[in-house]
Swiss-Prot record:
Gene coding for it: PSMA2
Protein name, per record: Proteasome subunit alpha type-2
Modified residues (N-acetylalanine): 2
Pfam families: Proteasome (PF00227), Proteasome_A_N (PF10584)
Residues carrying Phosphotyrosine: 6, 24, 76, 121
Organism: Homo sapiens (Human)
In-chain residues carrying the UniProt-annotated modification N6-acetyllysine: 70, 171
Annotated family: Belongs to the peptidase T1A family.
Length: 234
């Protein structure tokens, strides 16, 4: 009850030491579509559920797995409009880095800068935290990277993780299946199986998205490729 008076203030701590608006933002993430990231020995895979709004909806108009540079991509759980703002900011940050240094931005540098943007929205008046968590993958210095950033601006490197709806089940499944010698092909199968743990209804190439990142760069798998992977695990 004592927390209620602080729930509308972003910049004021509650008596228990919480910023309640951040707690609400994390709740938006936990209620969002599940997403999975797995770092393999030779690349990274991102996978997420993509709900079909209507048979009239043009699914090519909006994607959940997005490239930022040739070697970095990301996915989200939470609020789609907030995600698209962060995608735009991430691309702009990557372009600014390239203009200054004439080389692609390292994955860890981009994660740090995007997380700083998210953190600024936890201590400014007249704004609210972003209602998304991001999984950011990349390839540089001859190795793969996977990071998660949450609405507070905190970020961590991961070997494999799940977020969004039923993320606890996803993480438990990954803990049983993951090993550091995993190849990218196996990681793709594992990511899809992890999504399947909490998937409602029939999983098809139209309601999930998968992205991969390796030495060749980042790309989103085509629906035909996703269909083949689904057939392989059926």
């Amino acid at each position: 009850m004592a927390e209620r008076g602080y729930s509308f203030s972003l910049t004021t701590f509650s008596p228990s030491g919480k910023l309640v608006q951040i707690e609400y933002a994390l709740a938006a993430v936990a209620g969002g579509a599940p997403s999975v990231g797995i770092k393999a020995a030779n690349g990274v895979v991102l996978a997420t559920e993509k709900k079909q709004k209507s048979i009239l909806y043009d699914e090519r108009s909006v994607h959940k797995v997005e490239p930022i540079t040739k070697h970095i991509g990301l996915v989200y759980s939470g609020m789609g409009p907030d995600y698209r703002v962060l995608v735009h900011r991430a691309r702009k940050l990557a372009q600014q880095y390239y203009l200054v240094y004439q080389e692609p931005i390292p994955t860890a540098q981009l994660v740090q800068r995007v997380a700083s943007v998210m953190q600024e929205y936890t201590q400014s008046g007249g704004v609210r935290p972003f209602g998304v968590s991001l999984l950011i993958c990349g390839w540089n210095e001859g190795r793969p990277y996977l990071f998660q950033s949450d609405p507070s601006g905190a970020y961590f490197a991961w070997k494999a993780t799940a977020m969004g709806k039923n993320y606890v089940n996803g993480k438990t499944f990954l803990e049983k299946r993951y090993n550091e010698d995993l190849e990218l092909e196996d990681a793709i199968h594992t990511a899809i199986l992890t999504l399947k743990e909490s998937f409602e209804g029939q999983m098809t190439e139209d309601n999930i998205e998968v992205g991969i990142c390796n030495e060749a760069g980042f790309r989103r798998l085509t629906p035909t490729e996703v269909k083949d992977y689904l057939a392989a695990i059926a």
